[in-house]
């Protein structure tokens, strides 16, 4: 073993430039390999944290020239209730953005600007929210919300966040209430999933109910049998004609394992 090290040192001294180039090449090669491997693994496992991933689909609109994922609320609701093969659905407003919240009172008042997503309660039946404390059913209550664990710890420290109040100092888009009570804390989602780590709270039951112009919502559905997705779309497209834009139709594309 000593002779191997000795020969290695001698080679380095005699061929310094070649040895340096070889070592640098190996470092670069291994760095690139690790980067590609990490990226490949992230793509391969995208949304795989959700146990029902193979049966989850996002509703898209397609024309002869384009395709887009956002929907108007009445339309998404009509589709979600159109087939017995659709076991569950959720409608999400992902564009609320960050909202400034305060906690505490008077001289110990603290403020936090955090992302908010409004949605219908079915989201917790479709996607896997790993509960840390509280209840996922809290989204049935318009006063309550779900927080990611990292946010709960940042705001409330190591004490329980359940029952604590967050007061929005500005309007929450698509939400009537400004005061939210923490009803559940979920484990943070990894980066390779479609869901963001945000405050989830229920969408106002009256928001955009009759609005056929506001294309801001995402609609996800859970199917009992993924092989029926084309039939579901075909039946709905026939029963719900798009006029005057007759070439527009709905589709449920495979969204990388979801």
Describe each PLM feature range.
Residues 27, 97, 189-190:
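Feature marks short, surface-exposed loop/turn motifs that line or immediately flank catalytic pockets
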Residues 11-43:
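Short, strongly hydrophobic transmembrane alpha-helices
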Residues 18, 251-254:
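Short, cationic motifs built from Arg/Lys/His that form the positively charged side of catalytic pockets
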Residues 33-159, 169-178, 234, 241:
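Structured, solvent-exposed hinge/loop segments at the ends of secondary-structure elements
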Residues 1-6:
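Short, membrane-interfacial amphipathic segments enriched in basic
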Residues 119-133, 143-250, 257:
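Mid-to-C-terminal secondary-structure elements
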